[in-house]
Amino acid sequence: MTVKATDNGHKATAHADTGARDAGAAETVESQRTDTQRSDVSAQSKPSHRTALIDVGGGFRAIFGAGVMDRCQEEGITFDHCYGVSAGSANMVSFLAGQHGRNHKFYTEYAFRKEYASFDSYVKHHNFANLDYVYGTLSNHDGEYPVDYEAFAANPTGFTVIACNALDGSAKYFDKSDVHYDDFNIMKASSAVPVACEPYVIDGVPYFDGGIVDPVPVQKAIDDGYDRIVLVLTRPKDVLREQKRDIAPARILRHSYPAAAERLLNRYATYNDEVALAKEYERDGRVLILAPDDLCGL
């Protein structure tokens, strides 16, 4: 009887220990589940960053931006949205189409042709840069180096092109829906340098180069909800624009497009102010500025 009672005591103790272990394990599992749920909620509550790329263009200096985008393709870097000004908008079409090296060929080979940009082109077409040749003859589906329009259209990245309304001097923000098969007119509008080119007409409205109205559209990107922005400048970032080069063209332009002439006359201040703003955002960690150290004669 004594031995039996002792055995029962051991069994009771064993059952108690097992129950305690089970209860502890259950408590641990529940604690882990709660921690996981908290982590999930925390992860969901953290906003994901929205990224944008801005290329300010700048004539042949825009080859710098072309190099940046080729490198992005090599590294598999993509963005949620792209903003292009003037030649920068053309760079981005090739980038969004995934055509590595295409822009480089335009700047290093085609740009030396008389049909591309020359005094002869100005005499014949009233445009120093023959925009129809660049964005039509060369770029259409039957052109020498066509845009892969299907790839461009399939790319989910958003796209904004900036131009200046020649009539009232306001900024026009075209989007991807304004680009069609063999229709790259918004790039022509954004690249029509005042006086050097006639304004490019879209839907009855004449447009000039976007660089005279919103040359560094960082605030536009911020207002659109993008909080991580790569800004491609084509001048050293501490080099300011000067007004003197725009005074004579603005005087000529004033006779036909006074509002655009006023924009051109004040472009230097607009550019300098927008670069200063971009530097402030860079200090906050919202903007990364990429700029050449030297213009190399361009």
Regions picked out by a protein language model, each given a short descriptive name:
Residues 106-117, 253-269, 285-287:
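Short, basic, helix/turn surface patches
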Residues 41, 45, 139-140, 271:
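N-terminal short beta-loop-beta anion/metal-coordinating cradle
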Residues 47-142, 175-189, 230-233, 237-246:
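Patatin-like phospholipase
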Residues 121-241, 280-298:
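Active-site-adjacent alpha/beta core region of enzyme catalytic domains
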Residues 228-280:
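Helix-centered, glycine/charged polyanion-binding patches within enzymatic domains
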Residues 66, 215-216, 275:
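Residue-level marker for well-ordered alpha-helical positions
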Residues 5-44:
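Intrinsically disordered, low-complexity terminal tails and inter-domain linkers enriched
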